[in-house]
Regions:
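Glycine-/charge-enriched secondary-structure boundary and capping motifs
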Residues: 1-10, 14-20, 43, 64, ...
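Glycine-rich phosphate/pyrophosphate-binding loop regions near the starts of catalytic domains
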Residues: 10, 17, 21-165
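Residue-level signal for pocket-adjacent positions within structured domains
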Residues: 23-25, 31-32, 47-48, 53-55, ...
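Gly/Ser/Thr-rich beta-alpha loop segments that engage phosphate groups in nucleotides
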Residues: 31-33, 87, 128-129, 146, ...
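Short, acidic (Asp/Glu-rich) active-site segment that either coordinates a divalent metal cofactor
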Residues: 49-51, 56, 135-137, 151-204
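A short, polar/proline- and glycine-enriched secondary-structure boundary/capping micro-motif
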Residues: 56-60, 175-177, 316-319, 327
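Catalytic-loop motifs flanking and including active-site residues across diverse enzymes
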Residues: 69-73, 202, 221
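Short, well-ordered alpha-helical segments in soluble proteins
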Residues: 117, 144-147, 167-173, 180-183, ...
Length: 328
């Protein structure tokens, strides 16, 4: 059955089930001109938005399934919420689909969205559905809450801070190359690209332990660290050899001849967090969240990032994914 067979309202009826996972905060959900939800006294609201385009951000049957596309469209937004230190609460979405798309495929698309929302306690409040002449376009706007005055910005880094990142970097970019090459194996790299994990828990802990600046690694460490340096008017000194890499990434690079650090610095879509904080606070945070690696320090400066490789240090340019230049 195609979408053209069931129509817009049939489609809405088909997907609106199981969209509310936290009903106590919802006054009006799907079915009216707008959604109404309750806010929490003493909290501020965080809003983010992202778009994924079929053929540009995902290729069905090659780099993603419909389930994975739906999951990732939400995950990228929850990562932005996490990068502010906030707790995600609600989202709305706009989906452009072709009339020829099979209804079972839309079921999978929304199953991916609903599964990740259920995991993080996020309500789908509604949205918009339109016809696309060529490929799907998925736009998600997510909302979160954080204690008033506690949002962690890119602009808070201060000299003396430790620079740290979560988990390992470069897996998603490598996973994309593995998928495009049609390589067997490398399951962890493929999953890192298709179904990234937004670091919501770490974002909340960063607030608890007084993190000074925070950014999610969506475009690559080179880009995100430069954003912190520029916004904070400081310099970041990163140690290349301290950047955490997974064993599977190293194996892929041995086979493919690629540079694992290039994936970490410019690969993008890892959706890990890079943060800066006072050393004492960092070690307290690390006791509660062990998957953190110190990779550098903050010093007084003019907004540059330097990459140290043994005895050699060079300026690290803000290269990474750029939507309008089409790459680095």
């Amino acid at each position: 059955m195609k979408l053209s067979d069931i129509g817009e309202f049939g489609f809405i009826d088909r997907i609106k089930k199981d969209t509310i996972v936290n009903p106590a905060s919802v006054v009006v959900g799907i079915g009216d001109d707008g959604a109404v939800y309750k806010t929490t006294e003493g909290k501020e609201q965080v809003a983010v938005i992202d778009t994924m385009i079929e053929g540009r951000h995902f290729i069905i049957g090659k780099t993603a399934t419909w389930y994975e596309a739906g999951y990732k469209a939400v995950a990228s937004n929850l990562s932005d919420i996490a990068a502010m230190g906030a707790e995600p609460t609600h989202l709305v979405l706009s989906v452009a689909l072709t009339p020829q798309m099979d209804a079972a495929q839309t079921d999978e698309l929304y199953r991916g969205m609903k599964d990740i929302c259920r995991h993080y306690g996020v309500n789908i409040l509604g949205g918009d559905t339109v016809v696309s002449s060529e490929g799907a376009v998925l736009t998600v706007a997510a909302f979160g809450e954080i204690e008033a005055g506690k949002a962690v910005l890119r602009s808070g880094a201060v000299p003396g801070d430790i620079v740290a990142v979560s988990h390992t970097l470069g897996n998603s970019g490598a996973g994309l190359d593995v998928l495009l090459a049609g390589e067997a194996g490398y399951a962890a790299l493929k999953k890192a690209h298709a179904m990234p994990v937004p670091q919501v828990e770490l974002g909340r802990l960063a607030v608890k332990y007084g993190c000074h600046s925070l950014n999610d690694i969506s475009d690559g460490l080179a880009s995100e660290s430069n954003e912190i340096a520029a916004a904070s008017h400081v310099d970041l000194i990163l140690d290349k050899l301290q950047i955490p890499l997974s064993d599977e990434l190293r194996r892929w690079c041995e086979v493919s001849g690629k540079d694992p650090y290039a994936y970490a610095l410019t690969g993008g879509e890892d959706y890990e967090l890079v943060l800066t904080m006072a050393p004492d606070d960092f070690y307290l945070l690390k006791e509660e969240f062990s998957a953190l690696t110190a990779i550098g320090r903050v010093q007084a400066g003019s907004g540059k990032v330097y990459l140290k490789d043994g005895h050699h240090t060079q300026v690290l340019a803000p290269s990474g994914w750029n939507h309008f230049s089409g790459g680095e």
